[in-house]
């Protein structure tokens, strides 16, 4: 038994800057009754083609929808996803096909500790896109072990790009990022 530790740079080449995410309704990452809740090779292998297509189109990652109705948001390839909707931090509830990330849990617990409204629930892609249009969705960000906090500047769905937070990092994502990296660096 041994442990290897190694300092690394930012997970994304652009560092802590908003990423571009493509929503996939063509492919799925995990299915009901499967092992989407665990880090297994099969979950990653199933996502390779969609991620390749996203990168060829200039997107950083893929946002996965549920495998049955293909309308409920699940997670991004390398991180869980959060939305700031009407000043409430919302993330998809764990359904067995979403990885219960430790950074996800940290965001939920910190948000509650700070007195922010935090909710886990089912969120449709249409709710998010309509919220981006009418301003009720003010931020989108991911949370993961490697990425820590990653602001989303663009969501693409069915060939249409939707800008988030004017393409800038929002204050909620920034607060979580600064706090979590502050813990890491001391």
Model-found features: residue ranges?
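Helix-start/capping segments and mature chain N-termini
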Residues: 2-186
């Amino acid at each position: 038994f041994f442990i290897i530790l190694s300092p690394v740079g930012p997970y994304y080449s652009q560092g802590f800057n908003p990423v571009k995410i493509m929503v996939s309704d063509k492919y799925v990452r995990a299915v009901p009754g499967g092992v989407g809740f665990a880090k297994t090779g099969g979950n990653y292998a199933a996502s390779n083609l969609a991620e390749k297509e996203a990168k060829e189109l200039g997107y950083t990652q893929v946002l996965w929808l549920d495998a049955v109705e293909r309308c409920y948001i699940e997670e991004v390839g390398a991180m869980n996803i959060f939305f700031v909707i009407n000043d409430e931090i919302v993330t998809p509830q764990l359904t067995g096909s979403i990885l219960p990330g430790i950074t996800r849990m940290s965001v939920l617990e910190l948000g509650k500790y700070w007195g922010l409204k935090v909710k886990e629930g089912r969120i449709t892609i249409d709710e998010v896109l309509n919220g981006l249009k009418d301003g009720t969705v003010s931020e989108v960000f991911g949370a993961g072990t490697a990425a820590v906090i990653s602001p989303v500047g663009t969501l693409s769905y069915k060939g249409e790009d939707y800008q988030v937070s004017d393409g800038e990092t929002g204050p909620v994502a920034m607060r979580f990022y600064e706090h979590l990296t502050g813990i890491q660096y001391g």
